UniProtKB/Swiss-Prot annotation:
UniProt-annotated site: Important for catalytic activity, residues: 217
Organism: Mannheimia succiniciproducens (strain KCTC 0769BP / MBEL55E)
Residues that hold a purine D-ribonucleoside according to the record: 4, 179-181, 203-204
Enzyme class, UniProt record, top EC level: transferase
Designated name of the protein: Purine nucleoside phosphorylase DeoD-type
Length: 238
């Protein structure tokens, strides 16, 4: 057990899918996993372990923002032996060619957070996904006929940012989605010798104002979940 996870030793599979919302973790476990059992519930940050097509897989919420997700990913890796983390979350779009409900595979993650600079002795850290996991996710998306984009995310510290001009900079640099966790998760994975990938669904468009409801975000973003789970199976074959 840890201060934030009350699961016993061995409760987690070596691969954990991590949405921000613990209720989405519950939905994934109940909808996609067989024989799923709740293994942790501290602060109602729910975690489950079951199987997907016979393969052990866990799913657990990580909360909002880099500080929260860094706590959970670090403890899963160092205390429970987790080898791979797949974030399955939502993001906002700033580019006109990126649409609501598009699936984005996060090859890298820029950030305005200083967390990785603290880790990396005040130097810039290239927060990138694991190549094999990225490749497996692309293969899974192609096999299922799911439209996807591959590219950079931006992990922001502020949800309600006053710096709206930064959206123009993000668009110029080709940022596909704005969220709050990927750069932190990639940093934690690198620091502790694990692998990570973020797969996000566009939940709202910052330019147009189009958005999905909280219920839709919790219950209908199935494409990214299927990509993540199928990529786990493909990764086992590599």
């Amino acid at each position: 057990m840890t201060p934030h996870i009350n699961a016993p030793e061995g409760a987690f599979a070596d691969v954990v899918l991590m949405p921000g919302d613990p209720l989405r973790a519950k939905y994934i476990a109940e909808t996609f996993l067989e024989n799923a059992k709740e293994v942790t519930n501290v602060r109602n940050m729910l975690g489950y372990t079951g199987t997907y097509k016979g393969r052990p897989v866990s799913v657990m919420g990580h909360g909002m923002g880099i500080p929260s997700c860094s706590i959970y990913t670090k403890e899963l890796i160092t205390e429970y032996g987790v080898k791979k983390i797949i974030r399955v979350g939502s993001c906002g779009a700033v580019r006109n060619d990126v649409k609501v409900r598009d699936v984005i595979i996060g090859l890298g993650a820029c950030t305005d957070s200083k967390v990785n600079r603290i880790r990396f002795k005040d130097n810039d850290f290239a927060a990138i996904a694991d190549f094999d996991m990225t490749q497996a996710a692309v293969q899974a998306a192609k096999a299922k006929g799911i439209n996807y984009r591959v590219g950079n995310l931006f992990s922001a510290d502020l949800f309600y940012t006053p710096d709206v001009e930064m959206f123009d900079v993000m668009e110029k640099y080709g940022i596909l989605g704005v969220e709050m966790e990927a750069a932190g998760i990639y940093g934690v994975a690198a620091e502790f010798g694990a692998k990570a990938l973020s797969i996000c669904t566009v939940s709202d468009h910052i330019r147009t104002g189009e958005q999905t409801s909280s219920e839709e975000r919790q219950l209908t973003f199935n494409d990214m979940i299927e990509i993540a789970l199928e990529s786990v199976l493909l990764g086992d074959q590599a």
